[in-house]
Design a protein with these regions (language model features):
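Soluble, non-transmembrane domains of envelope/secretory-pathway proteins that act on or interact
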Residues: 27, 33-48, 58-59, 72, ...
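Non-catalytic, structured segments within soluble enzyme domains
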Residues: 33-39, 135-326, 451, 462-477, ...
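Short pre-catalytic segments that frame enzyme active sites
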Residues: 54, 70, 78-89, 204, ...
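Conserved catalytic neighborhood of penicillin-recognizing serine enzymes
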Residues: 129-157, 215, 279-285, 400-460, ...
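Active-site-proximal helix/loop microenvironment
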Residues: 273-279, 470-524, 531, 535-537, ...
């Protein structure tokens, strides 16, 4: 009941008294008319659960009540609340403790379970009290009337002091009492009433003021909350704690008068201290990822739909997030000034599930100097040479292999009938005939462009889309040969996703940053089912061939001598990227169970100073990998809770290994002192992917062998063929008119050996610091 005194002008006071008198008369008339059966009398219903409460409020008010949407990491740690409109969590009647119901009834409507929506005794009492005091001491509104006001009246109507409004309220209250049970009315009221500080409903109030669930409330706390709806601003516990406690003491007295408390219980309750523990919002946990999830929710449910109390469980693991953030920040601090970069981004993907375990969009979300709120994992940037595996994947799908030969010789292309495009290697040198293994492992530009020219731009665009790259949606004629060397932008997230597909034996799994969504009533509305949505993007053989090149430390040693950040203590496949003008550095790599992508640069696209991916982004990638391997407690997120991670990559079935002549870039010799084993389909190819039959013979390593194992074809175009012949004259190779003229008798040559894996080390942070600081950050920053 209202017990707040407001001074009114005599005219307004008389008007209000007349209104109450009319209501009293109306109530008397209604009381002598035959009563309609209530819902409880005609068809007893069980107390409403949360779903029923939502259904009732929605049907009566015309819109679903907003609720707080919560976003969690994969282990159930709260990342963020979406509560722009206020905080509310709908609960069922049986979830509301008796002490809350008793305190509310004693305070607001002592005869709630006796009257039919209008408490005429309360109205008479209010009329008498107001007349005697010449102020409004009590309004006499029941809980049902208050609910009617909340559900059916506009904000302006709710505070209108008119006869018409009061009559309307009475009629609506009678309607509610006729068709709904007392439990349904009380449940709707306790979920809709405002408690101040953006807390709507009793569950939100318990959280906002005491950081508790309803079941954890004490009687003293319940009494305090019950007193707030009368005047939330006046009794605000944070601004006016003494007023709030005085109001609580009044509620305790009302509970005693209503028979809910004995005199001794009331006295003990008044003496019991009440400690406020304001709700602590999550501290900026994975903010770029949270915004990424919010965008997904808006796309799925609409701008208003995200305020429906969803419980959003995501794939992100705050331990991985803390680890990636720590290393990225340390690298920017360590090398940023030297190379003139100010920002870094990291994304970690689990290939089999499509889950995003970490998303570091910048090193500091709140740093305006680096535009920290921009998520650099989703912003398209030029990938540099990190895109080359996509080109090679398209080639391997079309009959090429790591042993296929391409000529690294000067070449130029005429574009648009005018411009000339002449690709160059970063060393400024040309290396003659190369197997694709050596060309990709050493990230040479000329072979990549020639390969793109050979297989066609449409083939690469098609393969890229299958692998997970969605950025390249322009008409095909908008793309040129610079596609092979990273001339077209792609987000780090999509590129890492493509690498994750390769890691998963060519099986594409859509990204599933959200694993499950439950609505405000706890019902599942979305469940990630990665295995049901997977598809074979490229063949397992093509994926393995790519992986074998990207994990070949020996093959890449010309451009990446050991030790480098690409050398890890376990077998990994990795590719770096450096763009023209030193604007973007990337390193993307994977194991069979983990893909990690790293970007280094400046958000404003300002050039760095002679920065290359292997020494800027590479150390972050390396240290993230090593830190994960060093901590078995992290393996559960990868699907290996038993603490044993698989080693290496799986050789596809129906394949054979064939030794082929091996040489390093620029060190060709016709004697072929060593051979390297390459993987082929069991049904060996009988022709070259270029279709070229003229060329030079090489020693064969096995019989049978595919032609590319023992044959060096001449380039097709006249200019390149002339350059190739000039190159060959100095090497004393035997020329033949057709590859069938070559002697395919096997020559025994020793096989090359891969260098041993290096012991674990950290390039950015020492192992000791990583072991302590990352876990401290995860526990302190994220409240684990």
């Amino acid at each position: 009941m209202m017990d707040i005194r407001f001074s009114l002008h005599p005219t307004l006071l008389r008007a209000f008294q007349r209104a109450l008198a009319i209501v009293l008369v109306l109530g008397l008339l209604l009381s002598i008319s035959p009563p309609r059966p209530t819902q409880a009398e005609s068809d007893p219903a069980p107390p409403p659960d949360a779903a029923r409460v939502i259904e009732l409020i929605t049907s009566l008010s015309g819109e679903e009540p907003f609720q707080t949407t919560r976003i969690y990491d994969r282990r159930g740690i709260l990342l963020a609340d979406i509560d722009d409109r206020g905080r509310r969590t709908i609960v069922g009647y049986n979830e509301i403790p008796d002490i809350v119901i008793q305190a509310t009834i004693a305070t607001e409507d002592r005869r709630f379970f006796q009257h039919q929506g209008i408490d005429y005794l309360a109205i008479v009492r209010a009329l008498w009290q107001n007349t005697q005091s010449e102020t409004i001491v009590s309004g006499g509104s029941t809980i049902t009337q208050q609910l009617a006001r909340i559900l059916f009246l506009s904000p302006s109507e709710r505070y209108e002091q008119s006869i018409q409004r009061k009559l309307k309220e009475v009629e609506l209250a009678q309607f509610l009492e006729t068709y709904y049970t007392k439990e349904e009315i009380l449940a709707m009221y306790l979920n809709m009433v405002y408690y101040g500080n953006q807390a709507y409903g009793i569950a939100a109030a318990a959280e906002v003021y005491f950081n508790k669930s309803l079941s954890e409330l004490t009687l003293a706390e319940a009494a305090l909350l019950a007193g707030l709806p009368q005047a939330p601003a006046m009794y605000d516990p944070f601004r006016y704690p003494e007023r709030a406690l005085e109001r609580q003491r009044t509620v305790i007295s009302l509970m005693q008068e209503a028979g809910f408390l004995t005199s001794s219980e009331a006295d003990a309750l008044r003496a019991q201290p009440v400690l406020f523990h304001p709700y602590q919002r999550p501290r900026n946990r994975a903010p770029h990822f949270v915004n990424y999830i919010r965008d997904i929710l808006i796309e799925r449910f609409g701008t208003e739909g995200i305020h429906r109390g969803y419980q959003v469980h995501t794939s992100l693991d705050l331990r991985y997030q803390a680890l990636a953030e720590r290393i990225a920040r340390a690298q920017v601090k360590r090398k940023g000034k030297k190379y003139r970069f100010s920002n870094a981004a990291v994304v970690i993907i689990q290939p089999q599930s499509g889950g995003i375990l970490a998303m570091v969009g910048s090193i500091d979300f709140n740093d305006k100097k680096i535009a920290g709120q921009v998520n650099m994992t989703t912003v398209p940037r030029q990938p540099g040479s990190a895109i080359k595996p996509i080109v090679y994947a398209a080639a391997f799908e079309r009959g090429w292999s790591p042993a296929s030969i391409i000529w690294d010789l000067p070449v130029y292309y005429t574009l648009d009938g005018r411009r000339r495009y002449a690709p160059r290697n970063i060393t400024g040198r040309f290396y003659g005939p190369l197997r694709l293994r050596m060309a990709l492992a050493n990230s040479l530009n000329v072979p990549a462009v020639k390969l793109l020219q050979a297989i066609g731009i449409p083939a690469v665009l098609e393969t890229a889309e299958k692998l997970g790259i969605k950025a390249w949606r322009q008409p095909q004629d908008q793309y040129g040969l610079s596609l092979a060397v990273g001339g077209y932008e792609v987000p780090l997230l999509e590129l890492t996703h493509a690498f994750a597909t390769i890691a998963n034996q060519g099986v594409y799994t859509p990204l599933y940053p959200i694993t499950e969504i439950r609505d405000g009533a706890g019902r599942v509305v979305f469940q990630a089912k990665p295995r049901e949505t997977q598809r074979q993007a490229i063949s397992p053989l093509a994926a393995y061939q790519l992986t074998s090149i990207l994990s070949d430390a020996r093959a890449r040693r010309m451009m990446f001598p050991r030790p480098s950040p690409l050398d890890t203590s376990q077998i990994t496949a990795v590719k770096t990227g450096t763009t023209d003008g030193w604007r973007d550095n990337l390193t993307v790599g994977f194991t069979s169970y983990l893909a990690v992508g790293v970007w280094i640069g400046n958000t404003n696209n300002k050039p760095m100073r002679n920065a290359v991916g292997v020494y800027t982004a590479g150390p972050i990638w390396h240290d993230v990998m090593e830190a994960i391997w060093a901590d078995e407690s992290l393996y559960d997120a990868l699907g290996y809770a038993d603490g044993v991670l698989p080693q290496g990559f799986i050789l596809p079935p129906d394949t054979v290994t064939i030794p082929v002549c091996d040489w390093l870039p620029g060190k060709f010799t016709p004697r072929c002192p060593r051979m390297v084993e390459e993987v082929y389909p069991a049904s060996l190819p009988t022709s070259l992917p270029t279709g070229r039959d003229r060329g030079y013979c090489l020693p064969a390593g096995a019989a049978p062998s595919p032609p590319e194992a023992y044959f060096l074809p001449l380039p097709k175009d006249t200019r390149s063929a002339a350059a190739a012949r000039n190159w060959v004259r100095k090497r004393f190779l035997r020329a033949v008119q057709h590859l069938n003229d070559c002697d395919t008798t096997p020559n025994k040559r020793p096989l090359v050996k891969q260098p041993k894996l290096l012991p674990p080390r950290q390039w950015v942070l020492s192992a000791e610091k990583m072991k302590t600081s990352v876990h401290l950050q995860a526990s302190n920053q994220y409240g684990e």
